[in-house]
Structure formats: structure tokens, C-alpha cells
């Protein structure tokens, strides 16, 4: 192993995560807080751990994350994407299994903009026939 640290950038909705992975004991630090403190919801924590559990490296890597923008779901998705990219930098042979699980592809869904004359992006004003 030439590099001691592996990097991956992850994005989801309006969130961007910078992920640094190195060989260690399995600590995940998000914005200088432990994962369990940063995310209150168990689903968010589960989403972050998914790629590590898939390749069975939960206890083998220390992960340091800086994440900005968006809300909980977007940030968790961005971290997952970043961890996936860092894992692929660590070992390219993990790519097929990560792709099969759907972690490699960037989720391009974003909030649709509100249009003029409508109440929301697609919600039309109530129609009264008479």
C-alpha cells in the first residue's frame, strides 16, 4: 500500500462530504464528532455504515469526514458516496460489489424548483368549476 490515507468526495442533494479513510480500528468521525453523536437517527447511521458492512471492513478502517450543506438524509447519503469512493481508491477490486449494491452511482435527484402560477413545484391551485 503506497498511500496511508484514501480520499473520496461524496455528494447527495445539496450536501458535500469529504471522506478520509485510513487503516485503523473502525472509528467514524463526522465534523469532529463521533457518528453516533452527529446523527440522532439510526437510519442515517445505518446508511453511513452500509458500504463498510458490504465489504466487511467495519473494524479495519478509521474514517474522518467533513460534511457541509443539506439536511440529515442528504449528508448521510453524501458520506456513504464518499466512503464508497475512498474504498474504491483503497482497493479497485471492490468496485463490482459496491456497484451491484448501488453505492457507486451518484443519486442525481434534487428538489424541483417552484414554478410561477403553481403553489409548489407541481401542485396547482384548487380548481372550482362554479
UniProtKB/Swiss-Prot annotation:
GO CC terms in record: cytosolic small ribosomal subunit
Domain of life according to the entry: Bacteria
Coiled coil: none
GO molecular function: RNA binding; structural constituent of ribosome
GO annotation (BP), single: translation
InterPro entries: Ribosomal_Su5_D2-typ_SF (IPR020568), Ribosomal_uS9 (IPR000754), Ribosomal_uS9_bac/plastid (IPR023035), Ribosomal_uS9_CS (IPR020574), Ribsml_uS5_D2-typ_fold_subgr (IPR014721)
A Pfam family reported for this protein in Swiss-Prot or TrEMBL: Ribosomal_S9
Entry-linked PANTHER family: RIBOSOMAL PROTEIN S9, SMALL RIBOSOMAL SUBUNIT PROTEIN US9M
The protein, known as: Small ribosomal subunit protein uS9
